[in-house]
Amino acid sequence: MRVYGGKGGPSTRMGNIAGYRAAFADAAEYMKKRNAAASKPDSDKDSGGKRDLKLDTLAGAINGDILVHIHCYRADEMATMIDLAKEFGFRIAAFHHGVEAYKLAYRLAAEGICGALWADWWGFKMEAFDGIQENILLVDRAKNGCAIVHSDSGEGIQRLNQEAAKVMANGRRIGIET
């Protein structure tokens, strides 16, 4: 989540979620109008209003046509986004950078949500403070869990095999063979 400060955007997690909810509510209403217009005779097709590509994208997420990937570090943020997804009927495919995903590994597995996670990078800012080396392993090992080793740098992607080896070593350290 971003902090906008003087730029006029939300500066709290609650403000961000309020913005997301408003956007999805707008998309649901937009979708309803567009669907109603599409079911009318050809002469009334324009009653659905002007096409809005931003709302089309969110409507596509609600309809299941678009895979939703969300960037969240903290477990409480992930839980809130899962609640938002349930409220508006969309499915989250994956959380990226979820350094606290281990805290809700079983919920992620139950919801069919994957984690695209770092092997051992956390603590670089407050939102990323509570990570553990076993994060990927614990998310993946939950019944029906899904986690992949992630890198968002050109340098890190060249050594993804080494990042995966770190995950395996961390598993062995806590008694889990991979």
PLM features: residue spans?
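A generic structural motif
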Residues: 92-100, 104, 177-178
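His/Asp/Glu-enriched, well-ordered alpha-helical/loop segment
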Residues: 67, 109, 113-178
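Glycine- and other small-residue-rich loops at beta-strand/loop junctions that grip anionic moieties
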Residues: 47, 70-73, 96-97, 128, ...
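Polyanionic/metal-chelating signatures
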Residues: 1-94
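Active-site environment of divalent metal-dependent phosphoester hydrolases
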Residues: 75-79, 98-105, 155-157
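Short hydrophobic/aromatic-enriched beta-strand-loop microsegments
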Residues: 90-97, 114-119
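Amphipathic coiled-coil/heptad-repeat helices and related helical stalk/stem segments
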Residues: 54, 77, 101, 131-132
